[in-house]
Amino acid sequence: MTKLGSAFGEKYQAKRKDLLTRLFVLNGHTFKVRIPLISESDAIYKKVSDPDEETIEKIYQEITAPLRQFENNQTEDFEFINDDILVEGRSMREAAKNKAITEARITEFFKLLVPEMEGVTLDDLTYADIEEEFPIAVQMLIVEKIGEVISPTYREARGN
């Protein structure tokens, strides 16, 4: 128990979990979201903004596999340069990194959801699990809603 937790007493301890969660409703379903501590938010930001090279490489291989057939027939649309493929001037390695960032953001935000069933955890949730359940449009909508409830509003930040 923390110093503040002790000072606020047993009733506070009983309600602490509720204090650190917020709700949002999406199509009639109520989702609970755990508000991350600052250190957790920092860790999420780091994980999202700097995906590991192994993940980027895996995604790169997946998205460029169909393009490899054009390696001997390069055109202005498909250009093979060192360790990258440019499609209409756009780097597929950069596209893979952006996809890794998006998937990490979605996964880390979904891990903030509080399961309804007692004893269930989302700590080991993967993007594949999320993708299996929701199309990308719904994933992005849920992430947007999570972002809204975990970010303080101007009024809350100002203290009025």
Region annotations inferred by a language model:
Residues H29, R34-N160:
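Short, surface-exposed, charged amphipathic helix/loop patches that serve as local interaction elements
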